[in-house]
Structure formats: structure tokens, C-alpha cells
Amino acid sequence: PSNSYLYLYGDMDMEAKLTWLDEHYLSRFDYAWIDSEIKMQKPFEHPVEWKRYYSISNTETEEMNTYLSYNKVVGTSLDEKLYLAFEVLDYALLSAPGAPLKRALTDAGIGKDIMGSYDNGIYQPIFSVIAKNANVEQKEAFVKVIEDTLKDIVENGMDKKALEAGINYNEFRYREADFGGYPKGLMYGLQIMDSWLYDDEKPFIHIEALDTFEFLKAQVGTGYYEELIRKYLLENTHGAIVLIKPEKGRTARMDKELQEKLQAYKESLTEEERKELVERSNALEAYQSAPDAVEDLEKIPVLSREDISKEIEPIINEEKRIADVPVVYHEIETNGIGYVDVLFDMSGVEEADLPYVGILQ
């Protein structure tokens, strides 16, 4: 476990849990120094170009089926301001209604769909602009439109409302912390790794982000975001243009090459080696399909009725009137988010007209 990362989440006796971990797990091992440092990739002297291929069927066309991607490395994930600032820029440039970079590429007829991507879960985050269903011949125009549009934004300034909307959007997601069906503790743990993996002293910089959001709000209209675009997108040589081109029959060709490789390997084995390989394969299959022993299943902890609290959450209703309209106020912890539901009396609507009420949404 010398190279492991352990974290606890929830309301608990932390000292007791850490003591248990030490006595039942960590103390049973000797410490070993593991050189697991993730090295910084040196910047390129000039942006590079990569071409890769994906398979399409013989009935599909290669026309308008290429993916174009403009990619730049943006600092490191240990910079909490950059970590969120480019989330905001991704929204403002490529996702918001009327996003200028997406609109410029769409108006130029490059690709059938434009999207942005910001991978900030790695040591050196990557900001990408992607055109789906484009042509290889559009590569130069793709790069030119992106850089001309970004230069214009740097010279004339970002749309303040788009930046504010991007900040609000990301702050709302942060405060609400709605991870769908995934456990909140698990998702926090994964986000902690965005920084903890690269610096043992900075595990919480991305989950304690309210100060960073306040900083980003204060930078709107100051030239801060325009400078980020200039520094990390326009003048940054650490980037790549990636083309993913369609190729008919690629899957069949690769399957054939694999079969030939496996056949050559098989022929290189002795009869005894082949027999041993079959026996190992059969043993693995038998192990995987064997039912678990009852004593092993009983080791899995389960909840009993006594473990489940019988107390229910209190209902907090405070009735008020605002402008002679009845209001029911619930004072509960929402992490700074206000939720408002407005209800209308529909008793005056004829039953036959009720299906049409949804049109008003």
C-alpha cells in the first residue's frame, strides 16, 4: 500500500477509523519507496500534426466523415484558477447560445457538428475544439477560423454575459453536487485525484472552490480571460492538430493481421506448450464460473433493521404571504442555491382544455 491513496468520506470518528486502518491493514506492511511521479511533458517547439484512422463499412462514404481536432496544453491541474477558468471559456466559446467559436466554424461550413472539450483531470490539461463529420481538405480552414476568431476576441474582448453565464453554470453544478446515481463520496474522491495525484500537499484545491469562483467573477471585464486565450491558445506551441480519417475495410484488415499473428504464435509453440496453454485457459474459465463459497459470501457486511434509523427527517414548513400570495418557505441546507416552485390554481380551466396547458411551459 506504499503507493496507494486512501480517503474517508462522511460523518465519522476519524481517529477511530484511521486507527482501525492502521491496525488491520497498514501496520502489516513495511514501507517501500515507489517512484510513481508523473513527469511533466516538455512543450513542443512547434505544434505537431497527428493522423489516425478509424474503420467504416464499404457502404459508407469517406466524404464528410473526418474528425478534426485543435488541441492545446493548458498549464497544470495544480493551478486551481486555470482548472476552472478554462471550464468557463469552454462554455463561453463553444457551448453557450451564440458561442462565437462554434458559430464561426459553423458559418464557415466546417463539419456538421462543433464541440469543445476540456480534459482537466490529467496533470497537463488539454483544451480541444472538435469538428465532427468534416473533410481532410478543411484542415487549414479549420485552424485559420479558430485562430482568427480567437484573435478577434482578444482584441475586442469577450462577451461579459457569456462569461458570467459560464461561471454561474459551473458554480451551480459545484454547489448542487448532483452526480446522478453515483455516490457523492466517490465522485469527490475522483475529483481529489485531479490534484492529489500530482502533489500530496494539494488534495482539496478543487473541492474547496468557492474562493476560486469569486476570483473568476471579479476578473470579468479586466482582460483576464482574453489574456488566457492569448497565452494558452494563440501563442502556445504545446499543441497538436489531430485528424481522424475514415478507412474502408480497416477492421477486416486488422482482424486478418491479428489472426495471422496468432497463427504464427501457435505454430511456434511445442505440443507441450499448447497443451499447457489450453489447461491454463480451462482452469481460468472454471475458476470464473465457480459459485462463491457460502463462508465467503457471509463475509460481506449487510445492514440489519437495527442499523436503519427509525427517525424521519423533520418537515420544515413556514407559511408566509408575499404581495397577498401564500408562500410556503422551507429553511434547509441547499449550499447557497435557492429553489423556487410557482404553482397556479388550474380549477378554472375546463377539463377538456387541460391537455393544452402544457403548451405554456
Language-model features and meaning:
Residues 45-46, 312:
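Extended assembly/interaction regions that build large supramolecular complexes
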Residues 50-55, 211, 222-231, 324-327, ...:
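Short alpha-helical segments and helix-capping/turn motifs at coil-helix boundaries
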Residues 56-59, 114-119, 328-330:
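Short beta-strand/turn micro-motifs at beta-sheet edges
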Residues 81-93, 337-361:
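Active/ligand-binding-proximal structured segments within catalytic/core domains
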